[in-house]
Regions:
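Conserved Helicase C-terminal RecA-like lobe
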Residues: 67-230
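Conserved RecA-like P-loop NTPase helicase motor core
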Residues: 187, 191-286
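Alpha-helix N-cap recognition
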Residues: 7-10, 167, 251
């Protein structure tokens, strides 16, 4: 009724009253150039908007509640692409130009396929071709270095870490998986296999409860999972000391959901670290600017 009363029942009317479109230069999805893009990005007339919203909502933020949560320290870990990744990015750019120019049927190639390949390539070159070598400077190896360093440093406290990755989930068919690669490398360095677990292994509520309990006790010290499976409802914060975002999800709210697993009431650590890994000159840069 309030929207109708103020002639705001149609989105165009609401958007012109409270929103503003902004045109800015941003990276192209394939990561090789820039373009001007107009987005619905700013709000104004905020007092009127909030007054209208508060007619149907009672707002309490975490800051207003003053919940005792740890202080988070964010670290952006940027790595250089391999020569093979650079070549593959160039190939993605060529594909994108053909798609934009209408030179290829959408059933053969399209921007969705290209962006999906771009996400995989930014994660690890073996995602597109598992016959390619393990690049020493990859963000997967940078992540393994940090996980192991923190695992070793916090051994006396049995602190735990979460590793988020939405792509390349565990597989048993012999194909390359980032999950399997990270666990294998940690075990090779001396981390007990029982301390590195996948959320996907807990395929029932009973198994999930047991896994969460072991993580809270410090028996499982590295837990890997996707935002969908290890986001909302995952309460393992008791000993969490670090969180690793190996890839970037599509929605900013998913990053908040991930961080909410460690920046959480009940965490015994006053300070925690959140690492976000980016492969330069790839689709990672496009995703994080969104």
């Amino acid at each position: 009724n309030t929207l109708v009363k103020n002639n705001l029942q149609h989105f165009d009317s609401w958007a012109s009253t409270f929103g503003e479109t902004v045109t800015a230069v941003e990276l192209t999805p394939e990561g090789t150039g820039y373009r001007a893009k107009t987005r619905f990005a700013k709000f104004y007339n905020l007092p009127e908007l909030m007054a209208m919203f508060k007619e149907v909502a009672d707002i309490k933020t975490a800051d207003m509640l003053e919940l005792p949560v740890p202080e988070a320290h964010f670290h952006n870990v940027a790595v250089k692409p391999s020569e093979m990744q650079k070549e593959m990015v160039a190939s993605l750019a060529e594909r994108a130009e053909k798609v934009r120019g209408g030179g290829v049927d959408s059933s053969v190639d399209n921007m969705l396929k290209i962006t999906n390949d771009g996400r995989k390539l930014a994660l690890d070159q073996r995602m597109l071709n598992d016959m390619l070598p393990d690049f020493e400077g990859s963000k997967i190896n940078a992540c393994v270095d940090n996980i192991y360093r923190i695992w070793e440093k916090t051994a006396d406290k049995k602190s735990a870490q979460l590793v988020f990755c939405d792509l390349s989930t565990p597989k048993n068919d012999g194909t390359f998986s980032v999950y399997n690669d990270i666990r294998k490398k940690l075990i090779e360095r001396g981390v007990p296999e029982s301390e590195v677990r996948f959320i996907h292994e807990a395929d029932t509520d009973v198994k999930k409860k047991e896994l969460f309990q072991k993580t809270r006790k410090g028996e499982v010290r590295v837990l890997l999972g996707s935002t969908q499976k290890m986001g909302a409802g995952t309460n393992v914060q008791d000993r969490l000391i670090a969180l690793h975002d190996v890839d970037c999800p599509w929605r900013p709210s998913d990053l908040e959901q991930r961080s909410g697993r460690i920046i959480r009431q009940g965490n015994s650590n006053p300070d925690v670290d959140i690492y976000r890994y980016v492969t330069e000159q790839t689709f990672d840069a496009y995703l994080y600017q969104l």
